[in-house]
Amino acid sequence: MAKGTFERTKPHVNVGTIGHVDHGKTTLTAAITFTAAAMDPTVEKLAYDQIDKAPEEKARGITINTAHVEYNTPARHYSHVDCPGHADYVKNMITGAAQMDGAILVVSSADGPMPQTREHILLARQVGVPYIVVFMNKVDMVDDEELLELVEMEVRELLSKYEFPGDDLPVIKGSALQALEALQQNPKTARGENPWVDKIWELLDAIDAYIPTPERATDKTFLMPVEDVFTITGRGTVATGRVERGVCKVGDEVEIVGLRDTKKTTITGVEMHRKLLDQGMAGDNVGVLLRGVARDDVERGQVLAKPGSITPHTKFEASVYVLSKDEGGRHSAFFGGYRPQFYFRTTDVTGVVELPAGVEMVMPGDNVSFTVELIKPIAMEEGLRFAIREGGRTVGAGVVTKVLE
């Protein structure tokens, strides 16, 4: 199976469809799999109903329905997520269950931007989806060229309003349904053989060109959340955890950040499954031996990080999804002054919620932004995910949108 190994050399990019209900996200997702499969038989073709009955998965204690599809373009390998319901999108984007390197915003040309179009763009901005490509769907239902131009202008303005480069990003006009039907009639429809299928290729070209290949986790600065600490007699203190990003090796200086004053130390050993390693890298579960650090100097909930790369903070703004009662969340609203636990990486820290002006209370099932002040500092940066818990049970999920102090 030489082919399988060859595919793996392509850069991997995570994308997803976003946009208003019934604007054609799932139909487009199906059309993309059929288009890619016409060129590459290893791609699994998925019909609308196979994608629509998305399996449930759990992320940070929250149940989300998400469909995952995969496909190749000549340049890349893509993982693509599509969610059946609006609430699933909100939960998905806030928990980071499906991290997106870029999103395909689907807008019906017949309707133009709708409330969820705006909401998904805002969410993409808040949770840090860096790039958006637009697919104006259902152009076969619009006879008036001027109307199409008007919708395109509206979409570009809306994106600019939320600080995406609305004037410059790609907008592809097509019909996912027409493309899908053409491919269902002739699954081998190649590029250049059908104008609707060509529009899907145009979209794939646009995501290839416009969404940059993400920096690999191993190329980023080192960070490891501490899960456990123990002492090896005669050797010193070991912190264990899964390396979140970057690489660590013997001799590297690191800082221990969060919960107390930042402390600098040097790595004197890295091991995995009781074997010594040259280096630990993103994704590895490792034990890191730290020079001159007492057993009580480091604890679960702190992080080991490259010096100067991350700082401890107590106050931040967040975008939050509050679980509904049916999802096992609270049964009643909460108000300003609410004091739950905020679970960051490996530990809970109590914090106080301050609601924005004009917001009296927050109901279960709401998506809301507010400010939090923690009683202890946590190593924090924008884009960091957390869960909100009461007595160990998850009642919400959030993402840090702005670090305040």
Curated annotation (Swiss-Prot):
Binding residues for GTP: 19-26, 82-86, 137-140
Name the UniProt record assigns to this protein: Elongation factor Tu
What is its subcellular localisation? Cytoplasm
Q: Where is this region: G1?
A: 19-26
State the UniProt keywords alphabetically: Cytoplasm, Elongation factor, GTP-binding, Hydrolase, Magnesium, Metal-binding, Nucleotide-binding, Protein biosynthesis
Example GO CC term: the record gives: cytosol
* Record lineage: Bacteria, Thermotogati, Deinococcota, Deinococci, Deinococcales
This protein's superkingdom? Bacteria
Q: Which reaction does it catalyse?
A: GTP + H2O = GDP + phosphate + H(+)
EC class, as a word, reads: hydrolase
Q: Describe the family membership recorded for this protein in Swiss-Prot or TrEMBL.
A: Belongs to the TRAFAC class translation factor GTPase superfamily. Classic translation factor GTPase family. EF-Tu/EF-1A subfamily.
Q: Which gene encodes it?
A: tuf1
Q: Which organism encodes this protein?
A: Deinococcus geothermalis (strain DSM 11300 / CIP 105573 / AG-3a)
